[in-house]
From Swiss-Prot:
InterPro entries assigned to the protein according to its UniProt record, in alphabetical order: Domain_X, Maturase_MatK, Maturase_MatK_N
GO BP terms in the entry: mRNA processing; RNA splicing; tRNA processing
A Pfam family this chain is assigned to: Intron_maturas2
Keywords tagged on the record: Chloroplast, mRNA processing, Plastid, RNA-binding, tRNA processing
Single GO MF annotation: RNA binding
Keyword Transferase applies: no
Keyword flag RNA-binding: yes
Compartment(s): Plastid, Chloroplast
Protein name: Maturase K
UniProt similarity note: Belongs to the intron maturase 2 family. MatK subfamily.
Gene: matK
Length: 531
């Protein structure tokens, strides 16, 4: 009897039907949309999903997967798995992105985003702009303003040793359904067997599944830094090092979870969709904000596969932190050999004046000398010189021109060309594509110190748009620039960027020194969409 009761309890605990019902309700439109693009129709029903899961658990169906033939039922299961990974891929800490001024969004989005603005910024919804230009590079503001307060830096590159069993080990913390985990394992093994083949064998669903596996691997490493911050707070692991410090100097700040991509800002429907999932993840799954405590200065930044952890501490603490990270990688993430992990601890003060490459951007280290003279009553103290180190971010214009040359918008020397494949679109649609392309480049590089050099890139896009329209209407470029196109739209006015838009990537409670940057630039900030 005891065994029967335990079996019933385990069956009710592992096989939760409400999970499948929830996934079907939230993914019905997505699966239907993808099924139409792949020229097949999948009727979504709870019985069909359970039937597909039962077939996937049989041995003779696993051989079908090895041959590379996915039926309609497996395509539906693959879509459901991808959406199920959305709940798992919610970052432990992320950033909020305020919208543009000219666009209107629901009040719920405004209340969730405008929780704490930077002291250098003003509320954009009151018709005011920021006092200084910030963009995606505002995540690097700590390099310019606060990096001199940190004396040691720990850096590493994430080596994606993606194995199906490692991903399943991570998923088990969030999903308790044995059948669904078994589906994960079969699909992941099927994907890994086809990684060495040509990309033509993959479809959109498989690409999304591979990207989800990569994100799960990276977010698990981000969770390690969040847990280690809490251990520093409790002074359990690092008590011998932090013993001289007083606990009263720690001040608590809360990092709220809210993540909106750049594509979501441009599309209101996707924006509402992400807000809904954010509320659902907080209420139903109980994800609460994580409390962090600052100690001196601490900064964590991850961009794609490179992460940086800088703080104000001694060398013993940083080496201990690096040792714990390497042990976490070897025991938890499957890197059984230390030569896969190369965490480096070096002194920031040893950075030279030459240009270096950090996280894919050019960084230049400058030194400023401040002359200080103190006078007490009639006594004048000797003159002292304070040396302050700054790190500047440069925008390589030749790389931008090279990217435009790749998409046939200009020559290798920067001479504008017409876009032949866009001549089949309407006039407004052509201008809108060039406008979005220009705004995306400006937003990305507006945080650099030489952002004024982007005016040359603006001229390239402007004349490339004019040449595309001239090629379409069989006229000259001068006539296109001087006359108005459809709906009284002038190209000179469309590409006028006097209004300064900005994207803030600051956290709540800006006055604190703690910074945790979670940047996912992979497949989110593209120069243009595929034709």
């Amino acid at each position: 009897m005891i065994g029967v009761k335990q079996t019933k309890r385990l069956y009710a605990y592992f096989l939760r039907e409400d999970l499948y019902i929830t996934l079907v309700q939230h993914t019905k439109n997505q699966i239907h949309a993808t099924s139409q693009t792949n020229n097949f129709i999948v009727p979504i029903s709870f019985f069909r999903i359970k039937k597909a899961i039962t077939r996937m658990r049989k041995q003779h169906n696993i051989t079908i997967l090895k041959q590379g033939n996915l039926s309609d039922e497996y395509q539906a299961i693959l879509q459901i798995i991808n959406v199920a990974l959305v709940y798992i891929n919610k970052p432990v800490f992320s950033l909020y992105v305020p919208s543009f001024r000219n666009q209107t969004y629901p009040k719920q989005f405004i209340n969730n985003t405008i929780t704490g603005l930077n002291q250098h910024h003003t509320n954009i919804y009151n018709g005011m702009f920021s006092k200084r230009d910030v963009s995606i590079h505002s995540a690097f503001l700590f390099l310019e303003n606060r990096y001199h307060s940190c004396n040691y830096l720990l850096e590493d590159k994430i080596h994606y040793l993606i194995h199906p069993e490692i991903i399943i080990r991570i998923i088990r913390k969030y999903v308790f359904d044995v059948c669904l985990i078994h589906c994960y394992r079969i699909v992941f093994y099927f994907i890994m067997m086809h990684l060495n083949r040509s990309k033509q064998t993959f479809n959109y669903s498989m690409d999304q599944a591979i990207l989800s596996m990569r994100n799960i691997y990276a977010i698990e490493i981000d969770s390690f830094f969040a847990d280690e911050s809490l251990k520093i707070l409790n002074q359990t692991t690092y008590s011998p090092i932090w013993a001289p410090y007083d606990r009263s100097i720690f001040h608590k700040c809360t990092l709220y979870e809210f993540h909106v991509t750049f594509k979501s800002v441009l599309n209101r429907k996707i924006l509402k969709h992400i807000i809904y999932y954010s509320k659902l993840s907080k209420n139903k799954y109980g994800l609460s904000p994580i409390g962090f405590y600052r100690f001196g200065a601490c900064h964590y930044l991850r961009c794609n596969s490179i992460w940086k952890f800088a703080m104000q501490a001694n060398s013993n603490f940083m080496y201990l932190f690096g040792f714990r990270y390497m042990r976490f990688i070897t025991r938890r993430m499957g890197a059984f050999y230390f030569h896969y992990v190369s965490s480096v601890v070096y002194d920031i003060r040893s950075i030279t004046k030459h240009k270096i490459v950090l996280l894919g951007v050019l960084v230049k280290s400058d030194n400023a000398v401040v002359k200080i003279q103190t006078q007490i009553f009639q006594n004048i103290l000797p003159i002292t010189y304070l040396r302050i180190q700054y790190i500047r971010i440069l925008s390589p214009n030749h790389l931008v021109i090279k990217a435009l040359y790749k998409y046939q918008l200009c020559t290798s020397a920067g001479y504008p060309l017409h876009r032949y494949s866009w001549t089949t679109f309407g006039n407004i649609q052509i201008v809108q594509r060039f406008k979005v392309l220009q705004h995306s480049i400006i937003f990305y590089y507006s945080g650099c110190i030489n952002r004024k050099a982007l005016s040359y890139v603006k001229q390239i896009l402007r004349y490339s748009c004019a040449k595309t329209l001239a090629f379409k209407h069989k006229t000259t470029t001068r006539n296109i620039l001087s006359t108005k196109i459809d709906q009284n739209v002038n190209i000179l006015n469309v590409f006028n960027t006097k209004k300064q838009f900005w994207l803030s990537f600051e956290l709540n409670n800006i006055t604190l020194n703690l910074r945790v940057w979670h940047l996912e630039l992979f497949n989110q900030y593209r120069l243009m969409q595929d034709d």
